[in-house]
């Protein structure tokens, strides 16, 4: 119904009256074409859909982002846009990804294994160095235990 709203609606918008403008700006910066709110999501390409979702996350005002495979469906330009957004993001982020290029840009890698959750300082390259050193130390300890 036009012109009517509930008190809860106003509470949700408190401090976010410019959300439409901020989202429109984010869409332009992400090189998304203008589209209306009534356009069905399935009519967007995979890359457009991912960028639109990411724009929403970045303008949400959240303190922390939880992103699952955020580079999926993005072309090179879209991935570069995302890398820039993450570099300038002031909040925290937990990102699940298999994208090595994205992981090399992260300041910390957290590995989830069947038995543990392990945190490694540094990007993906540093993570690989640390894992290799751990594996070599484990092999040496095993050889020492056997002899």
Pin down the residues of each PLM region.
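ABC ATP-binding cassette signature C-motif
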Residues: 1-142
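Short cytosolic helices in intracellular loops of multi-pass membrane proteins
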Residues: 143-147
């Amino acid at each position: 119904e036009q012109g009517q709203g509930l008190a809860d609606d106003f509470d949700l918008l408190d401090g976010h009256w410019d959300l439409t403008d901020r989202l429109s700006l984010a869409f332009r910066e992400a090189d998304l074409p203008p589209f209306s709110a009534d356009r069905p999501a399935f009519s967007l390409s995979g890359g457009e859909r991912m960028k639109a979702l990411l724009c929403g996350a970045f303008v949400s005002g959240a303190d922390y982002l939880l992103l699952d495979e955020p580079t999926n469906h993005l072309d090179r330009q879209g991935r570069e846009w995302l890398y820039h957004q993450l570099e300038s993001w002031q909040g925290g982020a937990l990102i699940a990804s298999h994208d090595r290029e994205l992981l090399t840009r992260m300041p910390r890698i957290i590995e989830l294994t069947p038995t543990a959750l392990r945190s490694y300082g540094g990007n993906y390259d540093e993570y690989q160095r640390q894992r290799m050193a751990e594996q070599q130390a484990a092999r040496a300890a095993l050889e020492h235990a056997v002899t």
